[in-house]
Amino acid sequence: MNKKMTDYVIDLVEVLNKQQKQVFWGIFDAASMISSIIVSYILFYGLINPAPVDYVIYTSLTFLFYQIMIGFWGLNASISRYSKITDFMKIFIGVSVSSVLSYLLCYAFLPLFSVRFIVLFILLSTFLILLPRITWQLIYSRRKKSDGEGEHRRTFLIGAGDGGALFMNSYQHPTSDLELVGILDNDEKKKGQKLGGIPVLGSYDQLPELAKRHQIEKVIVAIPSLDPSEYERILKMCNQLGLKCYKMPKIESVVQGLHPQVGGFQKIDITDLLGRKEIQLDESRLGPEITGKTILVTGAGGSIGSEICRQVSRFNPERVVLLGHGENSIYLIYHELIRSFQGIDYVPVIADIQDYDRLLQVFEQYQPAIVYHAAAHKHVPMMERNPKEAFKNNILGTYNVAKAVDAAKVPKMVMISTDKAVNPPNVMGATKRVAELIVTGFNQRSQSTYCAVRFGNVLGSRGSVIPVFERQIAEGGPVTVTDFRMTRYFMTIPEASRLVIHAGAYAKDGEVFILDMGKPVKIYDLAKKMVLLSGRTENEIPIVEVGIRPGEKLYEELLVSTELVDNQVMDKIFVGKVNVMPLEVINQKIEEFRALQGSELKQAIIGFANETTHIH
């Protein structure tokens, strides 16, 4: 078979789904057993009668038992590029045990055939079943090598615990480009032991010495619970030694389908190096809030809005209304969700939050139980140049959403705010501060419950500092930092989205919720870690200070003193009481803002927002 033909066959089978692969291999295995019984009969007796009933029954029983056994082992959809020697042994055992069981069952009521006949049948069946799998593996391996993927990399695995065992069990197969040389673990008791036949050579503190001795090229970290500071230390050692460093994905991301397999690995990213572990919150109260209900998310196509949609979908709502102004982003999240979750009615709605009548029509039509308001303009320098748009979207848009919630009798609204709303020097933060006042104002007069959630900087969101640094590093630098003293609070997109959903569950009376994000992080330190992650040095990728941009602060705050309350609703979540202003006063201010433009509008909004920070 020439190369083009083998490539065609491989590509053809690779596109089959799991059920189709089960049928494919099931038919092939059945044909192998039928061929084996025929060949065995001819070899023993020199002829074959037309369809002897005892042999038909025997072969059918053997195939049935065999399918049950390999199904139990998870091999009935096995494509051999993932097969291991242990899989081949299981196939041999499956054929042998199935044949013997069938023989014993047939012993009582069918003419017997000799034990030698059974042995020959077992050997022939095993050979014919394994032949295409091994051939497939060799062809696939050859194609990988011809594509430049087949070179084996001498590799250390860090972690001989549960994570290491999972990795070894799911990844170690003959076509891998890894040559696992040894395992490193800081548990002295494990030194000298073996995991999957690979020895534990010592602790990962010995990485420099052992890597040179064994000519290592790659390191894979398989300790899901490893402290971020330890990740950073390992990464620094790898960079100094010129080694590529990877990690296992988190187990929950594998379970949720966000990563293809436990044994896959990915580069360590900046979220591992923020100095704290990702916060997990108690989800026991979330099911009753969401399950079987209609949820509406504004800004559903954005970074936070789309993640809120994913998170609420885990709790099986009846319907999720995806409301957004950008048709492309709504299209993408809609199709992602209908692929990922079954039994949920996803409704894509193109609407502008500046259009109150349209919002009211949507809210009355779908009657959501909760509205998560994530639509907003968020970029500080951009809004400094466009204050009117910040006013229209963040203030008028929020007012329209809150008013429609009240008019449509939606039980609950959760608004996404920002730590930049505290003592804001810029128009973006000021508009979000006014938006907080709007929702707390409505909370005072409406039957609906309103609350706000303040975020720090969200890693990985569109326009955040991480993709900017990545682009600058990819271009060879320099990496630009506005001020080496600048600090920010950081959280991941899943953390931010979970906080929003928890706020909806705990909201009672116009609270503002803030996640405990640990200590603020210096942007300069973040830039240095990003350069480190790239495998480069600061000599190769310089980091330069360019000066604070209009509207930026050196330090962000989470709460002011007048917003503090004594209790926390739950561990890792602070709750504050936003100072309330009557809606009549807010309405009057909004009308004043409508008449202003440019710098006058900007100063008016900033001035009003700061005046309201310390009201009682």
Predicted feature residues:
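Strand-loop microenvironment adjacent to phosphate/nucleotide-handling motifs in alpha/beta enzyme folds
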Residues: 21, 280, 285-289, 441-457, ...
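Signature of alpha-helical transmembrane segments in polytopic membrane proteins
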Residues: 1-150, 240, 247, 371
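N-terminal Rossmann NAD(P)H-binding glycine-rich loop of SDR-like oxidoreductase domains
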Residues: 295-313
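A solvent-exposed beta-alpha-beta segment
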Residues: 45-49, 139-255, 328-332, 339, ...
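Proline-aspartate-enriched helix->loop->beta-strand connector
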Residues: 211, 215-216, 317-318, 363, ...
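Conserved Rossmann-fold cofactor-binding substructure of NAD(P)-dependent oxidoreductases
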Residues: 350-370
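Conserved Rossmann-fold NAD(P)-dependent oxidoreductase catalytic core, especially the SDR/UDP-sugar
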Residues: 241, 256-257, 373, 377-436, ...
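Flexible, Lys/Arg-rich cytosolic regulatory linkers and terminal tails that connect or flank
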Residues: 2-8, 231-294
